[in-house]
């Protein structure tokens, strides 16, 4: 009996590779995201991934873009709901902190900076900039750009050092999120959630 392998389209193959790379990033850190490891994870050859991404740097750049899309989509949805009073403003903070922490964005960013591959961060930075511009439309009275700057930097710092720093200060590991939530409510006037009826 022979096994028939379903042939993936180039886009499906790229998507599978990016999801595998993201899973490796979350499971084992950025050093585990290699063309060889991703290829093994999805049952493709190293040469196949070279064809799709050109190099390990190309894979990292695409992974950054992929993570950036997920991050900005989730944050944008959370902000819209919070502005309408349909979600706790904490959701905006949680999605931002999770993107850099649990989703591996902070480790990926730090690794790229340390390895000299800063250009690979451009897709994330561009997507965040576009999101902030959209969120700022009609809200000229709110410091959306400044709020985004401190929130992203707080989330990035928390992803890299937050738990250890909180422990050293005898604070709960979630303290940075609590502080960020208070600052977010104060700085942009997001509504507290309405009680559900």
Task: Describe these PLM feature segments.
Residues 16, 20, 24-58, 62:
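Helix-turn-helix
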Residues 62, 73-106, 138-141, 148:
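Hydrophobic alpha-helical connector segments
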């Amino acid at each position: 009996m022979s096994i028939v392998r379903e042939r993936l389209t180039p886009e499906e193959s790229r998507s599978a590779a990016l999801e595998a790379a993201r899973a490796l990033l979350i499971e084992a850190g950025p050093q585990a995201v290699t063309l060889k490891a991703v290829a093994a994870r999805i049952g493709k050859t190293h040469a196949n991934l070279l064809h799709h991404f050109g190099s390990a740097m190309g894979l990292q750049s695409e992974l950054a873009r992929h993570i950036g899309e997920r991050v900005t989509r989730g944050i944008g949805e959370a902000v819209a709901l919070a502005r309408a009073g349909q979600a706790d403003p904490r959701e905006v903070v949680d999605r931002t902190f999770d993107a850099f922490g649990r989703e591996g964005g902070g480790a990926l960013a730090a690794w790229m900076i340390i390895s000299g591959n800063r250009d690979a961060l451009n897709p994330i930075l561009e997507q965040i900039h576009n999101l902030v511009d959209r969120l700022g439309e009609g809200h000229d009275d709110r410091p959306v750009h400044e709020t985004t700057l401190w929130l992203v930097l707080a989330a990035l710092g928390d992803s890299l050092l937050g738990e250890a720093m909180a422990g050293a200060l005898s604070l709960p590991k979630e303290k940075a999120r609590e502080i960020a939530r208070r600052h977010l409510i104060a700085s942009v006037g997001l509504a507290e959630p309405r009680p559900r009826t």
